[in-house]
């Protein structure tokens, strides 16, 4: 059986917090023949105010409404919508409210065992990053699956 390579176009936070930019990027991605367009899901609750990048992440975080809009827009453009949650709360939103069954785990969250266990139960397909921090974290990750 031949495996198909899955192409994920990472928009991440490059939309600069502007939904019209995000939609424009989705249109461009559609023409690249990518299978998925991927964003990042976090909110102010995921951040601490003493984080040097707090203002940046606050600016580029997507609201729940933004997620719904971008998911629907992606569907209209015939490209699959995906996002990487940066907290259990955001994972619950993606899985339960948006009904997402495919989640890409951010490399920064590969050692968040609570998040990984939740996603393992709720997702049909978890797409994992290959950038593991060390051998121990790799073993913990593999043992969850």
Predicted features, each with a name:
Residues 1-12:
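N-terminal amphipathic alpha-helix/helix-capping segment at the start of soluble metabolic enzymes
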Residues 8-9, 34-46, 80-85:
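Short beta-strand segments at enzyme active-site cores
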Residues 10, 29, 94:
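Conserved, mostly hydrophobic/aromatic
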Residues 14-28, 64-65:
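Glycine-rich anion/phosphate-binding loops
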Residues 23-42, 97-99:
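Catalytic domains of carbohydrate-active enzymes, especially glycoside hydrolases
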Residues 33, 95-103, 120-126, 143-145:
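Glycine-enriched alpha-helix->loop->beta-strand junction motifs that scaffold or abut catalytic
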Residues 35-64:
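Glycine-rich, proline-tolerant flexible connector loops at the mouths of alpha/beta enzymes
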Residues 57-62, 79-87, 91, 101-112, ...:
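Catalytic beta/alpha-barrel core
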